[in-house]
Amino acid sequence: MSRTKKTRRITDIMPARKADKKPEQPKLSGGKNRKPTRYELDAKAREEKKKRKHKGLPTGSRNVDPAEQKKAAVKEVKDPRIGSRKKIPLMVEFVNKPEKGQIIKPVAVEEYKPHLSPELELEQLENNEILNQLLDEIEAGKTLSAKDQKFVDECLDRIDELMTELGIQDEDEDNGDALLRQFETMDINQFR
């Protein structure tokens, strides 16, 4: 059990302390405009001096009046930025939500195409299973849908571009003529 400090209660039996006694004010006779006497002025000055002398606060939290405590709490101005009760959404979609009737158009994001070297891109196109399957169907005499035909044309055009860029000639092109031209332009002294 916690200890409680004994407090002095003023009763009829106990003698009164000086601090408990109220100074006797001489009764003023006359109207409001009466000038106070020298004795009254001295008594008033003594009271004010006593108040100035003991202007410190009493020790401990026990001595605080609840009424004064409430007044102090009311006067305290809090910073409105601290302790906000407003809920903050964690998802960005809820913050930028359009008003009713308005539509935010989605921003078209360009697809990132990794830049491959021409040799690697050509190899990937030549080894493309879908393209090879479609080319086999064309050779077999089947007709392709417009979408598939467009895909085949784009791939073949890109293969031609890459081959010209790399300086590669198609093997099917006039093998006999190319060999003859190479033989005629070749220097025979080179093989001695």
Curated annotation (Swiss-Prot):
What is its quaternary makeup? Answer: Interacts with Der.
Any idea which UniProt keywords this protein has?
Answer: GTPase activation, Ribosome biogenesis
GO BP terms in the entry: ribosome biogenesis
Q: Residue span of the signal peptide, if any?
A: none
Q: Where is this region: Disordered?
A: 1-80
Highest taxon of the lineage: Bacteria
NCBIfam families per UniProt? PRK05244.1-1 (NF003560)
Q: Gene encoding it? A: yihI
HAMAP family tied to this protein: GAP_YihI
Citing just one GO molecular function, the answer is: GTPase activator activity
Q: Which family does it belong to?
A: Belongs to the YihI family.
**Keyword Metal-binding attributed:** no
Protein name, as recorded = Der GTPase-activating protein YihI
Residue spans of biased composition, Basic and acidic residues class: 9-25, 37-48, 65-80
Q: What does this protein do?
A: A GTPase-activating protein (GAP) that modifies Der/EngA GTPase function. May play a role in ribosome biogenesis.
The protein's organism comes out as Actinobacillus pleuropneumoniae serotype 7 (strain AP76)
